[in-house]
Amino acid sequence: TKASVGFKAGVKDYKLTYYTPDYETKDTDILAAFRVTPQPGVPPEEAGAAVAAESSTGTWTTVWTDGLTSLDRYKGRCYHIEPVVGEENQYIAYVAYPLDLFEEGSVTNMFTSIVGNVFGFKALRALRLEDLRIPPAYSKTFEGPPHGIQSERDKLNKYGRPLLGCTIKPKLGLSAKNYGRACYECLRGGLDFTKDDENVNSQPFMRWRDRFLFCAEALYKAQAETGEIKGHYLNATAGTCEEMIKRAVFARELGVPIVMHDYLTGGFTANTSLAHYCRDNGLLLHIHRAMHAVIDRQKYHGMHFRVLAKALRMSGGDHIHAGTVVGKLEGEREMTLGFVDLLRDDYIEKDRSRGIFFTQDWVSMPGVIPVASGGIHVWHMPALTEIFGDDSVLQFGGGTLGHPWGNAPGAVANRVALEACVQARNEGRDLAREGNEIIREASKWSPELAAACEIWKAIKFEFEPVDKLDIKK
């Protein structure tokens, strides 16, 4: 038996066991691409092997119990290392994990292994998980999004254009009745959705049950008047899973179409539970990514948002915030389009120019609609329509409620701008080049749009993104 072979105690280099450049990856392996910045004097192979070891079966010394199992079957393997272009002493280490290391249907367990203790490892100056390849053998153990893009369109009876939303502001401090009034005005004016802000849960100035009631009243009234299906993302995020489900149950009893969750602050376990409830009860699920920038904004350490996006698609959500490219929040265009495709499409080819390290095959898992939100207004509409296409939600908070004439005219301005852009695109016009002209033409017959154009004509948020794709300098 293995255990009787004689056990050699002591510390040995990780690379002797965990660096295997000849390894051929299996179709069932979970593959990870890490950006590794070793401490001075640590060779890249040792650093890459250390990552593979610490995120799978290894520990800092040889242990007697290694003899009781088959390390070859269970260990993570660093199978390829390449230097990062334009950076000194920085490498992409590719690690393959056998599928048996992970519990089925648990994003929580997957992340505990892959991005657990290893990120505090002393031999590395910094470590960032850039991408994951999730094999169908694993993704099939997840239910994924409660409904998906096509089911959502069918439920809402809205086709051939992006959907429009609005976050109700001021996000904290309104009473439930006034909050509901703002929802009604926006929906009545032509938006498809209004939204609870991510930090609206159940505070002293507005308890959740009151808000749910007044928002439901608002959307039914707007629905009756416009003949269109309306929704309000009721934020069910709570301090405990039980309380969260209680809120979702009440939303279902009110008959509303959609609820919302903050998936990173709420946690993947809670999120997956809520997604299962939503699927079983016909509720759409809108996901906000509050806290993501803590994890994904630094280029050299943490985890890229494309990994958080893949994890959300597995855990379950029908919408997720995904940057705007043009507004006030972080997001480089090619990189953003890369993870937008990872959210929506069935099959995404490896493409390093868009930050996609692996070909990802989701097989039949439903897609997630990306939400563009944050500092956008009517002048951005042509760019947003062109960048995100029809399967998206464009959310204008200040860009609706900041209209000089009030909320309903703000909603009218956004809807007119969107319909004008969609029509122009369908007629074959170039939105990137003629965008401003299209908006100007539409504003001639829409006084609401003209007023919006006037007030935001010079607003831009021009900063270089912190997290960029690697290119030769």
Curated annotation (Swiss-Prot):
The residues that the entry says bind substrate are 117, 167, 171, 289, 321, 373
Q: Which NCBIfam families match?
A: PRK04208.1
Keyword Metal-binding appears in the UniProt entry: yes
Regarding how it is modified after translation, the entry says: The disulfide bond which can form in the large chain dimeric partners within the hexadecamer appears to be associated with oxidative stress and protein turnover.
Instruction: Specify the domain of life of the species encoding this protein.
Output: Eukaryota
Just give the chief location class: plastid
Q: Which reaction does it catalyse?
A: 2 (2R)-3-phosphoglycerate + 2 H(+) = D-ribulose 1,5-bisphosphate + CO2 + H2O; D-ribulose 1,5-bisphosphate + O2 = 2-phosphoglycolate + (2R)-3-phosphoglycerate + 2 H(+)
This protein's record includes keyword Plastid: yes
Which EC numbers characterise this protein's activity in its record?
4.1.1.39
Site (Transition state stabilizer): which residue positions?
A: 328
Q: Which named protein is this? A: Ribulose bisphosphate carboxylase large chain
Task: Tell me the cofactors it needs.
Answer: Mg(2+)
Q: Where does Mg(2+) bind?
A: 195, 197-198
Q: Where in the cell? A: Plastid, Chloroplast
Quaternary structure per UniProt?
A: Heterohexadecamer of 8 large chains and 8 small chains; disulfide-linked. The disulfide link is formed within the large subunit homodimers.
